[in-house]
């Protein structure tokens, strides 16, 4: 363990206790107000690994995330279970083919003014998916240059043409590309499932906080064990039928409109 990773783990451990206390109080508030509902697993899933390219999984790059000694083995477990049932597996990587910010036709908008996009040229080693979780034959690697995997890509086309109802999302980062992909997925009618041991980020506490918030509002955060058990219990993918409608949820009564005193 390096000094840097040791410091990260120490801060993460100390933050965990504080965050758990905050989450316990927050969960009561959310439950009382009708949040934190479960969207549940559907019948016809796909897996998408968000930005598990070398820039995020290997040391030495500005985008590197710690915790890969946990993340990579859990991603491998999900791949093994998904492939055994013929479940589609997709990957994304952020790449930039026109990085000239002054050209007026760059493919990153103003993102270059916030993050070091110049360190991630297309076709570089850093933009390639980590060999430990390399795509199998026929699995698609989607190039993107936005946070979410949906805008400007064919992901939604791939999912709808395969009649996908559930999207299992892994990768990095929790606060950025994973979160935005999950938010877009639920808005487009897919059931987002996030295996908690497969999510990374660069700063202590960020993964824990974002998974808590995602679980309250945008998707179901589950253990990798639960996701693998779900995949293991599925029939072969070609024998599944999508579950398109959400399960009934308890309704919360809307508060009455506020009554304002007549102004004189």
Swiss-Prot record:
Binds 1 sulfate ion per subunit. Homotetramer. Residues 240-264 are annotated as: Disordered. This is N-carbamoylsarcosine amidase. Its EC number is 3.5.1.59. Gene3D superfamilies: Isochorismatase-like (3.40.50.850). The keyword Cytoplasm does not apply. The active site is at residue 177. Pathway: Amine and polyamine degradation; creatinine degradation; sarcosine from creatinine: step 3/3. GO terms for biological process: creatinine catabolic process. InterPro entries: Isochorismatase-like_dom (IPR000868), Isochorismatase-like_hydrls (IPR050272), Isochorismatase-like_sf (IPR036380). Keywords: Hydrolase. GO terms for molecular function: N-carbamoylsarcosine amidase activity. Its cofactor is sulfate. It catalyses: N-carbamoylsarcosine + H2O + 2 H(+) = sarcosine + NH4(+) + CO2.
